[in-house]
Amino acid sequence: MVDTKKEQERDELHRAIWAIADELRGAVDGWDFKNYVLGTMFYRYISENLCNYINSGEIEAGNTDFDFAEMLDEDAEEARDGLVEEKGFFILPSELFCNVRAKAADDENLNETLERVFRHIEESAKGSEAENDFAGLFDDYDVNSNKLGATVAKRNEKLVKLLNGVGDMNLGDVKDHSIDAFGDAYEYLMTMYASNAGKSGGEFFTPADVSELLTRLGTVGKTEINKVYDPACGSGSLLLKAESILGKDAIRNGFYGQEINITTYNLCRINMFLHDVGFDKFNIACEDTLISPQHWDDEPFELIVSNLPYSIKWAGDENPLLINDPRFAPAGVLAPKSKADMAFIMHSLSWLASNGTAAIVCFPGIMYRGGAEKKIRQYLIDNSYVDCIIQLPNNLFFGTSIATCIMVMKKNKTDNKVLFIDATNECVKVTNNNKLTPENIEHIVDIFAKREEILHFSHLANYEEVVENDYNLSVSTYVEAEDTREKIDIVKLNAEIKEIVAREQVLRDEIDKIIAEIEGNI
């Protein structure tokens, strides 16, 4: 049951956070400014997280008045190695968010101070298992950018406002509240930035309702999974949805993803930390997934979820090595150079565990286009890998109104049937976008789990039917849309027409009579 009061408090907090973030940016474009707000939030979080970790240990040991933030740097240095091993990073007391913020207004070199602090945080992880997780995390936080101001003084003025604005966000105290408050606020801000950014926002963020549906589809009947993977992970929100649905300890061996855009890659790693995912529980890489996959040693994955980039270009047959790549070779053909969608599908299938499920948002064209894409569909169907195709409503995503599909794949199917679901109308309109409600999601997942046939909504097609349709996997080929046009009673209509014609004749006769009388009087 939904806690209405808690939801209201959450909404109020979100509105307050967005008001602060929006006020902070001033005349700077929100999309450009997001890295500063989100980066500052991350700096605050890891500072408070480290303090809480150290203080809790000291209090348990009986040192009830201890506060790491008040220690001298030289005394704190003694604990550096142990803390890096346990937490993955270290921050000197003088460089904690609270202490830098307290002196910020009087620091004429605040830009240099922050630059040094961020460099020290990243360097603290060097040589440890967390090195790759922290390397370059603050690269997009340019304290000397003209976006912050034309002069050093103006830039520092903006940085002071940033520290105070994020410091004033009511995210609770880590020791008294769920640290997910930070993660929740971060997700909310990313949603707002993405919705205001149009196309570029849609490229890095999957709306929460779509993430929920994908993850629910991929975890039907499961209470835990070994690993979750996203080959185009964006800001990581879709990866993290598995934890919110199954529970914190239900992802036994962690989160894996790859992202080609370095700014988005940094946002993803920050997102992991803000959701209290330990550095040893996630592995996010920044590379081209199709050409340079980074998780050969980590696959297979029990859950694969992704909102793929739509019909982007890739090397394809220009690279002679790819046709022999074990991910693509089984289909005997490569996805077209101009449309990489099916390459991502084959990559995901290759890395899917035998007991796993892949739920992937796809561009609808891959369901019916000919050529190489048809041959790959044939391979998928002939080998019984396609479990379900779901047609989604249009306008669900930021920056595009296109109606996408979900392809669900499994390797352990016991039949060669494919369930087709037409969820075109499973949504409500919210401002400029459509949205899947909890009821919409529940309905789709319920029919998916039961593999149930419902007139005008779902159809379970056998192998022969798909072959007869030339391996076309468009939902409209198998699920007839309901005719919502008004049904016409022909007999009643003819009677009405006959009555109108008769009435018309009566009126004509009366008009003729009037005209005759007028002419007779002339």
Where are these regions (language model features)?
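Non-catalytic, mostly N-terminal accessory regions of nucleic-acid modification and defense proteins
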Residues: M1-L213, L217-G218, K222, D280-S292, ...
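A conserved structural/catalytic subdomain of Rossmann-like adenosyl-cofactor enzymes
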Residues: V2-T4, Q8, D298-I522
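Conserved, well-folded catalytic cores of nucleic-acid-processing
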Residues: E23, G165, M169, Y188, ...
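A structure-centric signal for secondary-structure junctions around beta-strands
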Residues: V37, F182, I225, R252, ...
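Conserved S-adenosyl-L-methionine
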Residues: S200-S306, S311-K313, D317-L322, R327-G332, ...
